[in-house]
A protein has these predicted regions:
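Secretory-pathway/luminal and periplasmic proteins that interact with or process carbohydrate-rich
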Residues: 14-20, 98-104, 209-216
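Conserved small/polar residues in nucleotide/adenosyl-binding loops
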Residues: 217-224
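Aromatic-rich carbohydrate-recognition surfaces in CAZymes
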Residues: 63-189, 202
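Acidic/polar, glycine-enriched structural segments that form the non-catalytic walls/loops
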Residues: 1-61, 95, 136
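Extracytoplasmic, non-cytosolic globular domains
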Residues: 182-213
Length: 224
């Protein structure tokens, strides 16, 4: 049991790799055209991470598996076992957005993959802030970046229909996902004292109720 336990702990650290070199340079592949789950016509850049007063990079840049559903496991475990990792990863994800506009779902080689759906990085970043672990990026800047990604054109992948009705047509699962991410963002807004944003995203998180008619015992997707 001890061997299995520590092997499983090791497993949760796999799938993430630093991509910045010893001199702080890293590849930026965020400038391109989305083609399904991939990016084409990429204009590759080399960027350099800022350093602190001691000459160390302020954080590292990472590749990672997609963060889809990690709010149920990895986000919690990292905060307990490796509290520096939610901070590191949050700073890295926000810098991806500073470079390319979008917060990646699963950053790859310094760029985007568009694997899975929604904006699964939001619960991770909010968790880092609400646990008092966010040290390497500005919380307000992180919030504004996530807010932009929760609007049409952002990584969350919603449209005007969702803004008006609160749910994703023909998809109860994606409705719950978007609602949960909106709820998470609302919690950070509360802590930051942004009452209007907390109310806005809090209200958006209630859209799932429209898919739960009293005559049913489960959520039912609306066709329109």
């Amino acid at each position: 049991q001890r061997t299995k336990f520590y092997t499983d702990l090791w497993h949760v650290l796999l799938g993430r790799h630093k991509i910045d070199d010893v001199n702080g340079e890293y590849p930026d592949l965020t400038d391109g055209q989305r083609a399904g789950s991939f990016t084409r016509d990429i204009r590759v850049k080399t960027r350099t991470l800022p350093r602190d007063a001691a000459g160390r990079v302020v954080h590292h840049m990472y590749n990672s598996d997609a963060f889809w559903l990690t709010q149920w496991n990895l986000n919690v475990l990292w905060g307990l076992g490796w509290p520096e990792m939610p901070d590191e990863m949050s700073a890295s994800l926000i810098r991806y957005a500073d470079n390319g506009g979008l917060i990646p779902r699963g950053p790859c080689a310094g760029g985007y993959t568009y694997i899975m759906s929604g904006c699964p990085a939001t619960p991770l970043i909010v968790s880092a802030y609400n646990k008092g672990l966010m040290r390497k990026c500005d919380p307000m800047h992180a919030f504004r970046t996530m807010q932009r990604n929760h609007m049409p054109g952002g990584m969350q992948g919603i449209g005007e229909f969702y803004l008006e009705h609160g749910y994703q047509p023909k998809n109860a699962g994606m409705t719950i996902e978007s609602n949960f991410q909106d709820w998470a963002l609302a919690q950070m807004a509360v802590r930051l004292g942004l009452e209007d944003k907390a109310a806005y995203f809090g209200n958006r998180s209630h859209g799932w109720r429209k898919l739960y008619p009293v005559s049913y015992t489960h959520l039912r997707a609306h066709e329109t």
